[in-house]
Amino acid sequence: NRSIPRGTSSGYPSIFFPELSNKKLSYFGSEAEFDFKSLACQNLMAEVFEIISDARVGLRHEHVFVDFPKDELRSCEKADAGLTRLISGAPLAYIIAFRMYFLSFMTAVQNTNTASGVCIGINPHGPNWSEIAREVKRKGGRCVAGDYKAFDAHGHPQLFWALLDCINHWYNDGPENAHIRSVLWLELVNSKHLAGFGEFAGSLVYQWQTGLPSGHPLTSIANSFENLCLLVLCYHDTVGCMYQFWDHVSPYVYGDDNLLAIALCVLSLYNQSTIELAMAGYGFIYTSELKGSEVVPDHRPIEEVGFLKRGFSFCEDLQTWVAPLERKSVLKSLYWCHNSKLKDEIEIQTFDNFVCERSLHGFSGYDDEVSFVYSILRSKRSLDKLSTPVQPWSFGQALLRSRTLEY
């Protein structure tokens, strides 16, 4: 698993201390190797061990999350409606303590993504995509792809506490460590957040009763497992039993997205329509991955569904399944530059990525589209450092192969 990124905020209360204003660099330095000898880092380590020591006897520290608008592209409709999403930043000391007791499990989930069905860590340009497509074909060739409306707002804390029981069973390292995890788990299911307006800004703390904080290290994994549990419960409600789920269904979930390879023998009972009805019983609005008003069939072939905004297409040249990103997402990637100070480097990198992603949509029209984009960037002098001519379709395929091998 990756180390803690040093270029992000260290959270509350560090943000209120000027000497700690340089994000996590204030603790770990900016050199290639982390600096653990600074006074700030030594104090941080002492705080981490105090958190663990108190959790051992059932004492919960006040770990406060700080909410801020997520810096991302949103559709015009969502932007006009003010539907900006929030990031909830976690305190650094808590993140370290949590990783000490949960990181091995998190790594195991990522390393077994398609095998377990929880696809955190999946590489759409690697063999994972073919594994999913082949499993759909093996099950009979029909599948369901779904999503939820306001998934985060309808979470069931009981499912998350049941997940903790499974995690402790996975570790099997004694009641003391299990108890520490149960105290640290409170910040996931009942997180505390900084609030207040006007003269009271930053002076109030309130606690969530449902939903998971987006900046928590385990939020994506926990949401994925809730998604999976709900799909199993719906199978029980529609088919009449639960124990055959893994025989007849191969689920793939990531957060609130899912794709289900369903055996033909249960397809009339467990499909898009019946899952939607069953989900309503648990307080969830389940839709297709398209999220629009478009009506989709109860089940579809793998070539007609999407997962994580990517489709499934068999590439004859590579003799493997590839994951074409939605065309509009491929084009929109060229519209924005996130950091004006690194504009030239970012535009070159974005163009390379565009070439790779566009190649997944086939040869037809590739040369015209890539040449058009290339000419615009050249006219802006963005690609002065790139002296090679516009790359042919075969280059996009070769770039894709290299990304697959590097993973």
Describe the predicted segments one by one:
Residues 1-407:
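Viral RNA-dependent RNA polymerase
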